[in-house]
């Protein structure tokens, strides 16, 4: 089944399942881009989850290879809600546009909504700030909110440069979130800290008294 069918049947994905699929999508995109292939129509309908659990990209009808594909690819490709702002402005096809579409896709799979609302083919959308993930998914960690906000940023230079960079950030953020935080001594043993401060204060006062008397 496609991820669009999965979303329709089950609704927004649990965090653990979402992270697994996000990693698969980013690894697949990274492999495509290293081969100089731009998919140009990333969306849940074009992502198939097989019985073997493998995620596969479908529909390469709009795929573009810079320097090899005929024409310059300036025609508006793909599905409007997944198109990057620069694609609407007629920018030359680039990996950044695939990464933006992947960001919208992953946002939708997690939240059940589009970050900028649904965009119709006849619209000329204005992109401001995406709706925070936490509005739809209060259970999402703060780092995930920040990660997806960067993925679907309206300015290309604010997004991830490559699928590999995005995947690394995803893995590192999750790992850091799972690591136990070393609590400060004041939190762990407040009585010990206050006793030590009291003793230190007493010693300072005694030293000052001795200095003043000599």
Features from the language model and the residues they span:
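C-terminal lobe helix-coil module of Hanks-type protein kinase domains
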Residues: 79-178
């Amino acid at each position: 089944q496609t991820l669009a069918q999965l979303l329709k049947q089950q609704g927004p994905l649990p965090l653990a399942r979402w992270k697994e699929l996000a990693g698969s999508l980013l690894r697949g995109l990274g492999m495509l881009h290293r081969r100089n292939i731009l998919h140009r129509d990333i969306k849940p309908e074009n992502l198939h989850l097989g019985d073997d659990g493998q995620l596969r990209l479908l529909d390469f009808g709009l795929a573009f290879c810079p320097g090899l594909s005929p024409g310059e690819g300036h025609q508006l490709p793909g599905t409007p809600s997944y198109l990057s702002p620069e694609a609407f402005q007629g920018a030359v096809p680039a990996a950044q546009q695939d990464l933006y579409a992947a960001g919208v896709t992953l946002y939708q799979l997690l939240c059940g909504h589009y970050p900028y609302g649904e965009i119709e083919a006849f619209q000329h959308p204005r992109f401001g700030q995406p709706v925070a993930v936490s509005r739809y998914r209060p259970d999402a960690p703060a780092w995930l909110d920040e990660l997806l906000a960067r993925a679907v940023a309206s300015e290309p230079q604010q997004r991830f440069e490559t699928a590999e960079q995005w995947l690394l950030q995803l893995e590192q953020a999750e790992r850091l979130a799972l690591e136990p935080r070393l609590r400060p001594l004041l939190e762990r043993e407040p009585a010990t800290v206050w006793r030590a401060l009291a003793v230190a204060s007493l010693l300072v006062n005694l030293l000052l008294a001795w200095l003043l008397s000599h």
